[in-house]
Amino acid sequence: DFMEMVGKRLEKCPMEIRYAYQEQTKMLPEGMTVPPERGAKPWGTSHAVLCAKNEIDGAPFAVINADDYYGKEAFKVIFDQLSASEDPYGYCMVGYELGKTVTENGSVARGICEINAEGFLDVVTERTRIEQYEGGIHFTEDGGESWTEVAPETIVSMNMWGFMPSFLQEIKDRFSAYLDEYLPKNPLKCEYFLPLPISQLIAEKKATVKVLSSSDRWYGVTYAADKPVVVAALKNMTAEGKYPDGLWG
């Protein structure tokens, strides 16, 4: 139960908490219905953000994966960037080096970033099967028939984004076109991922995404075998005084 595991702990923090629920029929374009054969599968990360539109209430906002550790500095740099921005289409993201986000326990999905000389995102491409091997890191798009090498220092998105309120209207306006194109092709599994509308807005020169960096390391549990590494890292940070012993009191 989410409230038992997370909600009650968050209530101890000195901040306002609002809950938004990603439901299949929520924010669906008028006249659109959920194919019965799709089951309960959600519509993806863009739709998840869209479902929080009313709770965000017209303010700049950040998006993260709830089960990832990004480090304290990452939150500071994204807050500072959003607070200082006066551009209604000036977005941002925190990038991490690919080599510091892979696991030896299996493949991972990452958003590979192409960044221009001014430090802004040109393209983010979702690679759903990236693997670390003895000679380096590579990805495949054809089930392992062929592989493409990728440098460990390549910057990737770990889904830590900073947006202005304009983004909510953009993903709402583009959701219908996405469903018109992709739902007939893949009614069971198509998902409206964040990199798609972001890449569209950049290509249209309608928005910019500043790529921020953090000295903190990202941690996540993709496989059960990753958990001991993350647990040890968090214990070390607690021992170093970065976090209190007994985080939730």
Give each language-model segment a name.
Residues 160-172:
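Conserved nucleotide-sugar donor-binding
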Residues 20, 62-65, 93-97, 213:
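Short beta-strand segments
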Residues 172-207:
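A C-terminal functional module that forms or caps the active site or interfaces directly
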